[in-house]
Design a protein with these regions (language model features):
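Amphipathic alpha-helical interface elements
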Residues: 1-72, 76-172
Length: 172
């Protein structure tokens, strides 16, 4: 089982949105770094002396933000994909600065989901419609549990869909 697959399974174990965002951002970073060598000249010498040093843990391409900017600048990922990667990164930066863990039911997580282009396509808009129905329903305690479970499910789906889109755009 790959590190990415292990982390995808760990998403189900996350107790709150803060933990979820930390794991999902690791997954996105791993996927970007795994695909990054494909955007460069495919030459062993170039890979050994230029690409590999860039990808080291302490190299200039260590952060998700820098890697996604490079891929976007090279025309390898779309603006929508770049924006979604940036949104994951920005929301993570925000939640880790909070004194308390951010919960799945937090309005900020709702806004995060609403602003993802990967979920705003016509075919995937039913996820947002389902969330809206539960968020604004009147069955408080029952709906709250279902709402949080739905948020977690949609977050996991959005992460998986973003990973698939990144891979599809890089490999085309």
């Amino acid at each position: 089982m790959s590190r990415e697959d292990e982390l995808l399974e760990k998403l189900d174990e996350c107790e709150n949105a803060t933990a979820f965002l930390q794991v999902s951002n690791k997954i996105i970073n791993l996927k970007l770094k795994a695909l990054l060598p494909k955007v460069f000249v495919q030459d062993d010498l170039v890979k050994e002396y230029a690409v590999d040093p860039l990808l080291k843990e302490d190299g200039p391409l260590a952060t998700t933000d820098v890697v996604s900017k490079l891929m976007f600048a090279m025309g390898k990922i779309s603006l929508e994909t770049y924006a979604d990667i940036g949104l994951y990164d920005q929301v993570l930066e925000f939640v880790v600065t909070q004194s308390e863990k951010v919960e799945f039911a937090d309005d900020m997580i709702y806004d995060f989901i609403k602003n993802q282009s990967v979920l705003s396509s016509q075919q995937d808009s039913f996820y947002l419609e389902s969330i809206n129905q539960l968020k604004f329903s009147s069955f408080e305690s029952f709906s709250q549990m279902r709402y949080e479970a739905l948020i977690k499910t949609v977050l996991k789906l959005s992460c998986e869909m973003l990973i698939e889109r990144i891979e599809g755009e890089i490999n085309q």
